[in-house]
Amino acid sequence: MHRKALGLPRNEIVQQIIDGIDDSISDFASYIPIGNVVKKLTTWQNQGAEILYLSSHSSLQNVKKDEIVLKKYDFPKGPIFYPKEKDWNFVIEEAKPDIIIEDDCESIGGEYQMTYPNLNKEWKAKLISIVIKEFGGIDNLPDDITKLKKWRS
């Protein structure tokens, strides 16, 4: 999330994005993790999960900013997949995840901005979709990846 959102309630962060008046919103290289996301992802990786990152950015320049944040905060290593002028079906075909965890995109229009709802039926049938509240974090998701695979939003 953008750095000026730190310490604010989720609903205020969403409103900041909707209003778009804070410069830190578009300063992607200065983004900060939400909650204990690094610990959670590391826990899953230690159980054998391969961590893949999906970026909403379509330019390599902005994806590089995502890389800066991932390295700065010691996120588990993993490739970053992004649209590259293609739709999400192509991105998912390239990444081939088992589970997709994404936020509900509340501040930018909701479901039509999300990945899973815009996939074809074939991919929807293959993937486990977990939707979290935007800026809500993943701390409440199970630490055990076998339980995560059974989780339903």
Language model regions located:
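C-terminal cap/substrate-recognition subdomain and adjoining C-terminal extension
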Residues: Q45-E50, S58-S153
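Alpha-helical substrate-recognition element adjacent to the catalytic core
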Residues: M1-Y82
